[in-house]
A protein has these predicted regions:
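Catalytic-loop motifs flanking and including active-site residues across diverse enzymes
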Residues: 14
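Adenylate-forming
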Residues: 17, 165-169, 187-189
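Phosphate/ATP-binding catalytic cores across multiple sugar-kinase/actin-like superfamilies
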Residues: 17-25, 94-99
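Gly/Thr-rich phosphate-binding beta-strand-loop-beta motif of the actin/hexokinase/Hsp70
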Residues: 19-62, 175-193
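Short, charge-rich binding segments
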Residues: 24, 34-35, 101-103, 147-151
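General N-terminal leader/first-domain-start detector
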Residues: 38, 42-94
């Protein structure tokens, strides 16, 4: 038989799953966990210890922009990719600034779920964030470099497909699948990291 589990606060599922991708736990520090969706960017500040996530501070969500994925020309796509990239960088830097102003001491890892297939920082040419592949072959490394230039701090950036991030929140259930009904229908499977 099947077990169907409905969760409270399903909008936090990807954020909770992202906590499992944090590789270095820094005592008394928080991590940024961002969920870049097709409609909104959900922003959270999370605290993680050896037993897992223990605090989630949800910030105001931001409207997603520049997530169109059909273009008439390559130039049109490149122009839109640059706008989307700048919007993402601004979102991250503004959120870091908010944390500094509100006494959240951040660790050196930022975890991001994204409504696009991604593997080791390489975004696939599919979906509203797929055009970011035109900005950099490895978008995680690109963000790391841009944030260092802007802020003088070196962050480790980890990007995960949003469905996979959600599923990670349920990784303790064997042979599981996570189904989401957001802007689009989504499916994710927990993976061994």
């Amino acid at each position: 038989g099947y077990n169907i589990i409905l969760v409270e606060n399903p909008a936090e599922a990807a954020i909770r799953g992202l906590s499992k991708y944090i590789t270095t736990i820094e005592d008394n520090k928080y991590n940024l966990a961002l969920d870049f969706g097709q409609s909104f960017i959900k922003r959270s500040i999370i605290s993680v210890d050896k037993s897992g996530i223990n605090e989630v501070h949800t910030l105001e969500k931001i409207k997603s922009k520049y997530v169109t994925w059909e273009f008439n020309t390559k130039l049109e796509e490149e122009v839109e990719a640059k706008k989307e990239d700048q919007y993402i960088v601004d979102c991250i830097t503004n959120t870091i600034q908010f944390c500094m102003e509100n006494n959240y001491e951040l660790g050196k890892e930022i975890v991001i779920s994204i409504a696009n297939y991604v593997e080791n920082g390489k975004l696939k040419n599919r979906g509203g964030y797929g055009k970011l592949r035109l900005i950099a072959d490895n978008y995680e490394e690109h963000l790391k470099e841009v944030l260092y230039k802007k802020l003088g701090t070196e962050y480790k950036i980890t990007m995960v497909h949003d469905g996979t991030a959600m599923a990670a929140a349920f990784s303790e259930y064997p042979n599981s699948v996570c189904i989401s009904l957001g802007t689009a229908f989504g499916v994710g499977f927990p993976i061994d990291k």
